[in-house]
């Protein structure tokens, strides 16, 4: 996906640091692949302007926490560019329900009535999928097409140019992608994936949300407010909405 294509633009602070990667041959090949799939009638999610929504919502210097996902939701109207998040009005996916359960158990915060995580992103939580597109009804359809190299570069750049970030690595895929992170410079918290298949193996009870805030406070930074406003009070003017 070339950065200048159509309406798709990378947020300026990210463009300055990782935009060069979008000019590489493998990204031109990815862009051609996406055009071919759309021409063949495939429905690609999220919509083009939302592919880079995670970067729009959380500029480079504002990142405090990184949550790594795998690839976007593949159901109608679900994916909007932030990992684990869905737009208001879309049923909350099972993995996110388990995230909410852990937040409630960890911090006493009641489960919200939606799955829209933009308020976290605005506070500095980069909600980054390893693969930024998918096709309707075909989980993982765009894996190994070029996105992973770009998002690896994003993680490597954060690791190198920032200090004291918290990386939340849930599941073996995220943990493998996070192997490059220097744990003497950053806090890395690992747990099984919040999927119903694995959450009971250690995600539930991991206390990652309170541990994240403890780390931020120790560094003199404001903690993340993991609570979410009710759906009726959401601000839907930002990227991805």
From Swiss-Prot:
Entry's EC annotation: 3.2.2.27
Signal peptide limits: none
Matching PROSITE patterns: U_DNA_GLYCOSYLASE
GO CC, alphabetical: cytoplasm
Reaction equations catalysed: Hydrolyzes single-stranded DNA or mismatched double-stranded DNA and polynucleotides, releasing free uracil
UniProt-annotated catalytic positions: 71 (proton acceptor)
An MF annotation (GO) of this entry: uracil DNA N-glycosylase activity
InterPro entries the UniProt entry points to: UDG_fam1, Ura-DNA_Glyclase_AS, Uracil-DNA_glycosylase-like, Uracil-DNA_glycosylase-like_sf
Biological process terms in GO annotation: base-excision repair, AP site formation via deaminated base removal
Annotated localization: Cytoplasm
Keywords linked to the UniProt accession: Cytoplasm, DNA damage, DNA repair, Hydrolase
Principal EC category: hydrolase
Job of this protein: Excises uracil residues from the DNA which can arise as a result of misincorporation of dUMP residues by DNA polymerase or due to deamination of cytosine.
Record-stated family: Belongs to the uracil-DNA glycosylase (UDG) superfamily. UNG family.
PANTHER family (alphabetical): URACIL-DNA GLYCOSYLASE
The protein's name in its UniProt record: Uracil-DNA glycosylase
Gene: ung
């Amino acid at each position: 996906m070339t950065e200048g294509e159509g309406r798709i633009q990378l947020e300026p602070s990210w463009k300055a640091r990782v935009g060069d990667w979008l000019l590489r041959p493998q990204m031109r090949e990815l862009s051609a692949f996406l055009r071919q799939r759309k021409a063949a009638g495939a429905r690609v999610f999220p919509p083009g302007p939302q592919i880079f929504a995670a970067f729009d919502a959380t500029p480079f210097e504002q990142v405090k926490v990184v949550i790594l996902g795998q690839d976007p939701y593949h159901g109608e109207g679900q994916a909007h560019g932030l990992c684990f998040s869905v737009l208001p009005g879309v049923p909350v996916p099972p993995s996110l329900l388990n995230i909410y359960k852990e937040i409630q158990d960890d911090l006493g915060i009641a489960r919200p009535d939606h799955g829209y995580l933009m308020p976290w992103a605005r506070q500095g939580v980069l909600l980054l999928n390893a693969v930024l597109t998918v096709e309707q009804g075909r989980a993982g359809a765009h894996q190994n097409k070029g996105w992973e190299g770009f998002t690896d570069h994003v993680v490597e750049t954060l690791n190198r140019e920032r200090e004291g970030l918290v990386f939340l690595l849930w599941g073996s895929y995220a943990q493998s992608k996070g192997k490059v992170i220097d744990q003497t410079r950053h806090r890395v918290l690992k747990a099984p994936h919040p999927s119903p298949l694995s959450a009971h193996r250690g995600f539930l009870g991991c206390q990652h949300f309170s541990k994240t805030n403890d780390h931020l406070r120790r560094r003199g930074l404001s903690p993340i407010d993991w609570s979410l406003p009710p759906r009726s009070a959401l601000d839907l003017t930002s990227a991805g909405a």
